[in-house]
């Protein structure tokens, strides 16, 4: 019996951001307890067929926690015990910032979705560096980098570079986030000239060739997606994360009129479309992290089949609860058996073969 699903109606009565804060605090506490390892047997699904080796890193499974849930790495020690193969902290900016005024996070239960306009609220790169220093985890930890609101677009590369260098030895991989709709002008940084400057400066500072990725919006046209993909090749990026939240609102059942990025089930098909486009454009040579609307094993398999090497969840995890990871991984293992693949990595892009 999934206790979370029984309790969800009660949990969803609370303000979304307050509930988030309480959950993060509880997870941070649990991660420090002697019995934290016991959670592995409850929520984990160890299966060597699901292991992914990418960028010189080993992922016990392809399912990771997307950036945004644990912005300040407060509960970073918990994610490996909840079955995740990796986790991404942030978005972190050079300067600490409070984000946008509340309310700024909204649930859309009828659509299995959420709208957020958080605005990169975080403690800043220096604080994150202090929190991560001297600690090690059993899964790869990525760091998602954003631009401070006070920093002009013309100085964006300075902002990203500061955070990158400050956190360089503390992350297993890094993500350039230029696709959040909640920081004024940020999406302009997806333009080839602006993004190219950021990537060039980061790669010049990338002495140990840490995996560097870019996270793109689902609202880009195909020409713009292709331009970003070309930049990834030009600057030797390790991959792309597809996709961030959307500003589109088509097909929603909810009549909530709030600005911000929409995540969850309504994003599922578009993000998979973008993944498939990038896979086809690069003939599978650019690793893709697929995110957007993953609630089930079927959703996860679709993204892998369309070209994703790794996956991330956030909104689906809020709706489905902590047992979701185990259910998805078990479903992927079953799909492997039915599809005749010996290992999950063989299934990447199989929709096009």
Curated annotation (Swiss-Prot):
Amino acids binding substrate: 71, 116-120, 177, 182, 244-245
GO cellular component: cytoplasm; plasma membrane
GO molecular function: dihydroorotate dehydrogenase (quinone) activity; dihydroorotate dehydrogenase activity
Membrane topology: Peripheral membrane protein
Positions that bind FMN: 67-71, 91, 144, 177, 215, 243, 264, 293, 314-315
InterPro entries: Aldolase_TIM (IPR013785), DHO_dehydrogenase (IPR050074), Dihydroorotate_DH_1_2 (IPR012135), Dihydroorotate_DH_2 (IPR005719), Dihydroorotate_DH_cat (IPR005720), Dihydroorotate_DH_CS (IPR001295)
Cofactor note: Binds 1 FMN per subunit.
Catalytic reaction(s) noted: (S)-dihydroorotate + a quinone = orotate + a quinol
Pathway assigned in UniProt: Pyrimidine metabolism; UMP biosynthesis via de novo pathway; orotate from (S)-dihydroorotate (quinone route): step 1/1
Residues the record marks as active site: 180
Keywords annotated in UniProt: Cell membrane, Flavoprotein, FMN, Membrane, Oxidoreductase, Pyrimidine biosynthesis
Superkingdom per UniProt: Bacteria
Cofactor: FMN
Compartments reported by the entry: Cell membrane
Enzyme class, spelled out: oxidoreductase
EC identifiers of the protein: 1.3.5.2
Gene Ontology biological-process annotations: 'de novo' pyrimidine nucleobase biosynthetic process; 'de novo' UMP biosynthetic process; pyrimidine ribonucleotide biosynthetic process
Keyword Nucleotide-binding: no
S-S bridge residues: none
SUBUNIT field: Monomer.
HAMAP family: DHO_dh_type2
Function: Catalyzes the conversion of dihydroorotate to orotate with quinone as electron acceptor.
Protein family according to the UniProt entry: Belongs to the dihydroorotate dehydrogenase family. Type 2 subfamily.
Protein name (database record): Dihydroorotate dehydrogenase (quinone)
The species this protein was found in: Gloeobacter violaceus (strain ATCC 29082 / PCC 7421)
């Amino acid at each position: 019996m999934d206790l979370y699903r029984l309790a969800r109606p009660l949990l969803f009565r609370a303000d979304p951001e307050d509930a988030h804060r309480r959950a993060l605090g509880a997870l941070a506490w649990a991660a420090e307890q002697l019995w934290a390892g016991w959670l592995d047997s409850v929520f984990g699904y160890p299966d060597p067929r699901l292991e992914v080796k990418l960028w010189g890193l080993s992922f016990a499974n392809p399912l990771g926690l997307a950036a945004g849930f644990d912005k300040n790495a407060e509960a970073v020690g918990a994610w490996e015990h909840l079955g995740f193969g990796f986790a991404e902290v942030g978005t972190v900016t050079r300067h600490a910032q409070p984000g946008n005024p509340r309310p700024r996070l909204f649930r859309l239960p009828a659509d299995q979705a959420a709208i957020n306009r958080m605005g990169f609220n975080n403690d800043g790169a220096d604080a994150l560096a202090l929190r991560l220093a001297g600690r090690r985890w059993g899964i790869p930890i990525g760091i998602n980098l954003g631009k401070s609101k006070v920093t002009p677009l013309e100085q964006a590369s300075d902002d990203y570079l500061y955070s990158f260098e400050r956190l360089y030895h503390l992350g297993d991989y890094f993500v350039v986030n230029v696709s959040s709709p909640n920081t004024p002008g940020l999406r302009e940084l997806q333009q080839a000239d602006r993004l190219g400057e950021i990537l060039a400066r980061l790669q010049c500072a990338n002495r140990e060739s840490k995996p560097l990725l870019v996270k793109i919006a689902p609202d880009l046209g195909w020409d713009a997606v292709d331009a970003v993909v070309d930049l990834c090749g030009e600057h030797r990026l390790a991959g792309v994360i597809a996709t961030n939240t959307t500003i589109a609102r088509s097909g929603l059942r909810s009549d909530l009129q709030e600005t911000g990025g929409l995540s969850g089930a309504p994003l599922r098909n578009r993000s998979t479309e973008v993944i498939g486009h990038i896979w086809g454009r690069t003939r599978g040579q650019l690793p893709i992290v697929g995110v957007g609307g993953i609630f089930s094993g079927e959703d996860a398999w679709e993204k892998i089949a369309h070209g994703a090497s790794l996956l991330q969840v956030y909104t689906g995890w809020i709706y489905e609860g902590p047992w979701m990871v185990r259910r998805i991984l078990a479903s992927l293992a079953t799909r492997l058996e039915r599809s005749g693949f010996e290992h999950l990595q063989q299934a990447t892009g199989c929709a096009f073969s």
